[in-house]
A protein has these predicted regions:
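Feature captures the catalytic cores and cofactor-binding loops of soluble hydro-lyases/lyases
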Residues: 1-153, 168
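A hydrophobic, small-residue-rich beta->alpha segment in the mid-to-C-terminal subdomain
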Residues: 157-168
Length: 168
């Protein structure tokens, strides 16, 4: 039924699963989208903590309202973690966001494990010791993104549980 609504062959995000299985996280909410792209000096020229208010990943977190799901296109990159950490995840929790879905990995896995926030990712953590955004940069907020071969628009409904993630 869902694929008939959105007009696509599949509404399942293959390869994206709960970061912390067995916690009983079960969410449904509209999407806020965040797109990452390969890093270029002009995308984030002065470092991660410069001009904090202008950074797209922070803007996306700040506009994710109660009940919404932040959906992140990181093109399956497992070398650079996106979001994560106690500050950005705590902000999501305080805003009562429904959850986080990342086609890639988050950063600060150990800190994220201490928070009871629903997260779905491609893998549990980065494949390098350096887990910040060194390969990719946040490019756009609330635009059309692609997750595991599916186009996701802001406002599309996201459903996620221990079995995985789908949209409609």
């Amino acid at each position: 039924v869902a694929r008939n609504i959105v007009g696509t062959q599949s509404t399942f995000f293959g390869g994206v699963s709960p970061l912390f299985r067995g916690k009983g996280h079960d969410i449904l909410g509209p999407a806020v989208t965040l797109q990452y792209a390969p890093q270029r000096p002009d995308l984030m020229p002065t470092g991660e903590y410069a001009k904090v208010g202008d950074q797209n990943h922070r803007i996306a977190v700040n506009i994710t309202e109660e009940g919404y799901v932040l959906v992140v296109q990181a093109d399956g990159n497992t070398r650079s973690g996106v979001l994560g950490g106690n500050m950005l995840l705590a902000l999501q929790q305080n805003r009562k966001a429904a959850g986080l879905v990342v086609h890639g990995v988050i950063r600060d896995y150990a800190e994220a494990a201490t928070q009871d926030f629903p997260i779905w990712t491609q893998d549990s953590k980065t494949t390098t010791d350096y887990d910040s955004q060194h390969d990719i940069a946040p490019l756009a907020v609330n635009g059309r993104i692609s997750i595991a071969g599916n186009t996701v628009m802001p406002g599309d409904w996201i459903r996620a549980d221990d079995d995985g993630v789908c949209f409609f």
